[in-house]
């Protein structure tokens, strides 16, 4: 007896075609092309999630560096001074302070300056 798989196959195709609904041209209509486009899109999404972390860290460091240089310290001196002083604050919070609360950021800069003896 032959095993028929029409229901599952149709469900699989429908799932892919539903996922690629807004794609351009044949990529949203033809199953074979749609499947390739879907796989590629998922791959790009995965890579993008990894790159996002990198990009945000770069942005935070740039913001901290600009704010620290306005106070007379380089980025690496600021981070080194904060580590010597035992201050546990991450780059995300430090950049938020630099942008939104410059007075608090200035206090952290002073702590770092005292720790490195500047």
Curated annotation (Swiss-Prot):
HAMAP family: Ribosomal_bL20 (MF_00382). GO terms for biological process: ribosomal large subunit assembly; translation. PANTHER family: 39S RIBOSOMAL PROTEIN L20. Belongs to the bacterial ribosomal protein bL20 family. Keywords: Ribonucleoprotein, Ribosomal protein, RNA-binding, rRNA-binding. The keyword GTP-binding does not apply. GO terms for cellular component: ribonucleoprotein complex; ribosome. GO terms for molecular function: rRNA binding; structural constituent of ribosome. This is Large ribosomal subunit protein bL20. Binds directly to 23S ribosomal RNA and is necessary for the in vitro assembly process of the 50S ribosomal subunit. It is not involved in the protein synthesizing functions of that subunit.
């Amino acid at each position: 007896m032959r095993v028929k798989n029409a229901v599952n196959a149709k469900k699989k195709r429908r799932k892919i075609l539903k996922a690629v609904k807004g794609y351009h041209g044949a990529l949203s209509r033809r199953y074979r092309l749609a499947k390739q486009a879907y796989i590629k899109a998922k791959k790009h999404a995965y890579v993008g999630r990894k790159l996002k972390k990198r990009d945000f860290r770069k942005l935070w460091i740039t913001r901290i560096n600009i704010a620290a240089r306005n106070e007379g310290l380089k980025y690496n001196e600021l981070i080194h001074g904060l580590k010597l002083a035992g201050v546990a604050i991450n780059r995300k919070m430090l950049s938020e302070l630099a942008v939104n609360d410059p007075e608090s950021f200035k206090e952290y800069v002073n702590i770092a300056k005292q720790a490195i003896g500047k």
